[in-house]
Amino acid sequence: MADVMPSRTGQVSRKTNETAISVSVNVDGTGVSKIATGVGFFDHMLDQLSRHSLIDMEIKAEGDLHVDDHHTVEDTGIAIGQALAKALGDRRGITRYASIDLAMDETMTRAAVDVSGRPFLVWNVTFTSPKIGTFDTELVREFFQALAQHAGITLHVQNIYGANNHHVAETCFKSVARVLRTATEIDPRQAGRVPSTKGTLA
């Protein structure tokens, strides 16, 4: 009888004085999402993250939006990262590495990931405006910093060029989605091994 892979799902509920967030993910999904953070542009970006990674995501966040969007965006990144870490477990059998150059109209963004258990973010993205609509562009980095830290991944994101700030932000989310999709896929040639000569990813 063939080995049956355990379900790669993760659920996190996180509550502080600033936010209350619940996240569930299915790494082996089809990119179905149900997202409500109260921040419209952020919801749009998270929908892209789910759709293009094929990771099913259900996210509900209530935050102190009367202050600003910062706590909601950062804490959502923390919760998604924690849920992904739970879903991936010991990361046995995964492809581990991936990179992509992703185009959207006039914009090109590069992302590379090592699902290594070692959190690190290299961020080389510059926005020409402090806001996209009412959304602070600096929060794009804050989200990915929180995601990388709590998912235990090494993530590099570089905007190569682009004139439209919405496109720059969107290609960051889409490119990260695509590398997560590839790097977390099960490689049948790994035969269930942890993809490291150390025998562990940490």
UniProtKB/Swiss-Prot annotation:
SUPFAM superfamilies according to UniProt: Ribosomal protein S5 domain 2-like (SSF54211)
A single GO cellular-component term on record: cytoplasm
Residues spanning the signal sequence: none
E.C. number: 4.2.1.19
NCBIfam families registered for this protein in UniProt: PRK00951.1-5, PRK00951.2-1, PRK00951.2-4
The protein's name: Imidazoleglycerol-phosphate dehydratase
GO biological process terms held by the UniProt record: L-histidine biosynthetic process
Species annotation: Rhizobium meliloti (strain 1021)
